[in-house]
UniProtKB/Swiss-Prot annotation:
Pathway: Purine metabolism; AMP biosynthesis via de novo pathway; AMP from IMP: step 1/2
Compartmental location: Cytoplasm
Lineage: Bacteria, Pseudomonadati, Pseudomonadota, Alphaproteobacteria, Rhodobacterales
Cofactor binding annotation: Binds 1 Mg(2+) ion per subunit.
Organism: Jannaschia sp. (strain CCS1)
Name of the protein this chain belongs to: Adenylosuccinate synthetase
Enzyme Commission number(s): 6.3.4.4
Length: 431
């Protein structure tokens, strides 16, 4: 049975939630493998909107096992609230349908406080555009071997020892940033209080998933954010604090690399970005505003307006390579309806030299100007199309040109937020 990884191939917000939900019908297990609740997925099911941040998208589908893997950093208080919200919408969530890896690091209140204080202290031009939810500092503690992990909640003495180790690091940082010292006892009490609500879902996820795989069950790995925010291959330092590319999927749940059979890259038919950092095809004119309005480009997590621009084939070709993308899902094609002319970035000019990739150095990225190829647009609507026959000829040509430029085929084409409005070319779960 095929196992599929879904990754964003741009700067996030590509429409992964809908595609994961669409694919989850074919999967037995849906697993989150990186990130925190700084990324949001919006699902529209039978007209009802579900907004998820920490929970895997599969929770809204009955009969599926949803998993939060060790590659995630988890805010336990946020998770409990999110579970309550989704339950209020009629979704059943129990230890039979949700598992959390025992070795998942926790996001503590001290992480969010540090995150926000750093961003406020940063000078103009050095702000990352973080959501302030503590994801970066939580990953720092993981790498620094001072995390409080899910399993630590089960024993008070162990919990206290891990909290003390973290405070040895955090208290000096807080003094330097002018933040009050941490109330150790209050933090331990808060963790002790929340512990039973988290521990009921705790499990050796690596073992469970290896057994599922041996039994021939289909696993869908759900990525958050996008490959251009990857800590190694993104537009550093304007990136997230985890590996986002497909290779992280196995590591982030405790499976070997041979567990991945198909990598589906989610690609928006234009480009958006939230927060700071380079964006070669950004439009600050009427076309950019039109893309934002038609695409409803506001962040699920923060409500921040997204920056919008033309499709960047050079960047997507790059992310398809670093994630080993087998095929893409092209989303929001309908947002381009009505444009007389469309532009696609095919490369960059850097100080007179043409490049077919975005360079690594931040100063060079900032100096790259896009080289465009123009294509005719279309006036007919593509919204709700469910077959190629429903698409205008110019829209089909646009899709085919995207495939040529990124050197990767379209497996799925999405034409609205509704899960049924999807054109299937290749089933990623096909054996």
């Amino acid at each position: 049975m095929a196992n599929v990884v879904v990754v964003g191939a741009q700067w996030g917000d590509e429409g992964k939630g809908k595609i994961v939900d669409w694919l989850s019908e074919r999967a037995d297990v849906i697993a989150r493998f990186q990130g925190g609740h700084n990324a949001g997925h919006t699902l529209v099911i039978d007209g009802e909107v579900f907004k998820l941040h920490a929970l895997p998208s599969g929770v809204v589908r009955g009969g599926k096992l949803s998993v939060i893997g060790n590659g995630v950093v988890l805010d336990p208080w946020h998770l409990v609230k999110e579970i309550a919200t989704i339950r209020d919408q009629g979704v059943d969530i129990s230890p039979e349908t949700l598992m959390i890896a025992e070795n998942t690091p926790l996001i503590l209140p001290i992480h969010g406080e540090l995150d926000r204080a750093r961003e406020e202290a940063a000078s103009s031009g050095t702000k990352i555009g973080t959501t302030g939810r503590g994801i970066g500092p939580a990953y720092e503690d993981k790498v620094g071997r001072r995390s409080v992990r899910v399993a630590d909640l089960a024993d008070r003495a162990t919990l206290e020892a891990h909290v003390d180790r973290a405070l040895q690091h955090h208290d000096p940082l807080r003094r330097g940033l002018g933040i009050d010292p941490i109330d150790r006892n209050a933090l331990i009490d808060a963790l002790t209080e929340i512990a039973p609500q988290i521990l009921q879902y705790a499990a050796p996820v690596w073992k469970v998933l290896n057994e599922k795989r041996k039994a021939g069950k289909r696993i869908l790995f759900e990525g958050a954010q996008g490959a251009l925010l990857d800590i190694d291959f993104g537009t550093y330092p304007f990136v997230t604090s985890s590996n986002v590319i497909a290779g992280q999927a196995a590591t982030g749940v405790g499976l070997g690399p041979n567990a991945i059979d198909y990598t589906l890259g989610i690609v928006k038919a234009y480009t958006t970005r939230v927060g700071e950092g380079p964006f070669p095809t950004e439009l600050e004119d009427a076309d950019g505003q039109r893309l934002g309005e038609r695409g409803h480009e506001f962040g699920t997590t923060t409500g921040r307006k997204r920056r919008c621009g033309w499709f960047d084939a050079a960047l997507v070709r790059q992310t398809c390579a670093t994630s080993g993308v087998t095929g893409i899902s092209l989303t929001k094609l309908d947002v381009l309806d009505g444009f007389e002319t469309l532009k696609i970035c095919v490369g960059y000019d850097l100080d007179g030299t043409r490049l077919d990739y975005l360079p690594t150095a931040a100063d060079q990225q900032a100096r790259c100007t896009p080289i465009y190829e123009e294509m005719p647009g279309w006036s007919d609507s593509t919204e709700g199309a469910r077959s190629w026959a429903d698409l205008p000829a110019a829209a089909i040509k646009y899709v085919r040109r995207v495939e040529e430029l990124i050197q990767c085929p379209v497996a799925l084409l999405s034409t609205s937020p509704e899960r049924e409005d999807t054109i299937l070319v290749t089933d990623p779960f096909a054996d």
